[in-house]
Amino acid sequence: METLEKNFKKEKSVFSAAKKKKNLSFAKNEKTTTLKDALQAGDILTVKITALGSKNIGVAELKNGYTVLVPNTKCGDKVQVKVEKIFLGKGTNSILNQKIKYVVARVDNSGTKTSNFEKTSNSLKFDFKVGQKFRVTIAKKGPKNSGLVPVAKNFLFIVPNTKVGENIVVEIQKIKQNYAFAKPILSKQMNVVQENNQMIGQQFHIVIPSSAKTIANSFVVKLNGQFVFVKKSLGVQLEDTVKIQIQKSTGTFALAKILKISPISSKEKKAMVKETVQKMIQSSMHFGEKAIRCNANMRKYIWYRKKGLGMYTNSKNTFVSIKETKKPMVKRGRHVLNVLKTQRCFAEALKQLAKYAAKGKTFLFVGTKKPAASLVAKTALLSNTSFFVNTRWLGGMLTNWKTILKSISQIRPILKQKQKILQKILEKREKIQRRLFNKVYLLRKKSQKFMIKGKYLIQQILRSKNFLIEKSQKFIQTKNALFSANALLLNASKNLKMKKIQILKQIQQLEFAAVEILKQKQPIKSFNSIKS
């Protein structure tokens, strides 16, 4: 057995070394290849079958890098074949860094009466085929956690992922000259039992169809070829998405219970957590208290960064850490909190609050910082059974409530007076607002009128280009007419003034004449009086 294993290892090492040399030589001479090295359909070759693949197809390798596939052959035979198809594969050779070349050929039976098969001394004496099944016992441990099964003096089965002493059924996958690769297979019954055991405890997200039947207080649903009896619970109805867990399973049916109604998938949960964490970071929730005021019990919720002192080894250039120290991350003089842990704590707190809310308990919301004050008030006002403190926490609000009630009774009259003053101020403000609104309304009306006039002028300008010129000429004519009328009026006023002056002169002359007449009358009167 030891000699077989040694021979197998030697053959493997020799084959790999020869293959590397061949590939390297081909890589060196690749630039100097001629048209003779390139194969064509119809070429006749003599190849040696080194392995058998699926469907008993022989595999041979050529020096120019081609892999020849020949059906209906045996491992170890030299065969004369005729090339039928040549194509390049999708894979690449890691040594040559080029595409793998494949050749499909068939055994050439034309032209010669002699046999095309030449059996060598190393040809396979046993008639094994790919796909055959055998029950074997693992005799010895092989390389890479594989098991070795000796079939004859010069032939082995290599079975991966097996242990020494296991009695299993194997199926041949590939045949080489002195060994074959096989994989372990299980019987159908073992597979069914294993599948049933694997099904128990598994969870599935399903939609209960509208056509689902109900038998003995449970829905009947078909899942992966099995009939699953889902117990009715949590108020489930038809066409609901539910999360179920398999409790019992057989080959044809299974029993399951409902865990959740309309569950959230893991991807959606991750997306929701990601969104919440981003919002927390955007609202600066990752900044804690000052580093000096840190409480020792809260250190587990701080974000730490690792600093390691290391060295590189000379042998494999690997980094080996000698000392690792944890230091808290500090920004702006404050500790950076682990937001993931805070999110988990929020989720746990939410569960507890939901339980208390379902029982009808009352809550007190406290948030005295300015950024949180408005949010605390809004959240507290959403429920009728909640109270909040968002300005300043008074000492003894929970422990000494009686004294606080007394101080509240003293403050109430002051608050009433304050409310009256505020009402007066608000009334004055309302009056001022009304006046301002009225003024704004009037200004809007005036502006609308100006807009209408402006639109009318623009329309007239667009209709006639000479509109302004004509209008200006009319204005000039009217202006000239006014000037001429003014001149006439001035002349008339001058004439009137002259006439007035003349009339005044005449009046003065008449007055002077009247005075003289009166002077003449006085001696006449005196004379008459003397006569009488």
Curated annotation (Swiss-Prot):
One of its GO terms (molecular function) is structural constituent of ribosome. It is found in: Plastid, Chloroplast. Belongs to the universal ribosomal protein uS2 family. InterPro entries: NA-bd_OB-fold, Ribosomal_uS2, Ribosomal_uS2_bac/mit/plastid, Ribosomal_uS2_flav_dom_sf, TRAM_dom. Gene3D superfamilies: Glucose-6-phosphate isomerase like protein, domain 1 (3.40.50.10490), Nucleic acid-binding proteins (2.40.50.140). This is Small ribosomal subunit protein uS2cz. Pfam families: Ribosomal_S2, TRAM. Disulfide bonds: none annotated. Residues 38-97, 127-186, 197-260 form the TRAM domain. Keywords: Chloroplast, Plastid, Repeat, Ribonucleoprotein, Ribosomal protein. PROSITE patterns: TRAM. GO terms for biological process: translation. Its main location: plastid. SUPFAM superfamilies: Nucleic acid-binding proteins, Ribosomal protein S2. GO terms for cellular component: chloroplast; mitochondrial small ribosomal subunit. It comes from Tetradesmus obliquus. Residues 1-271 are annotated as: N-terminal extension.
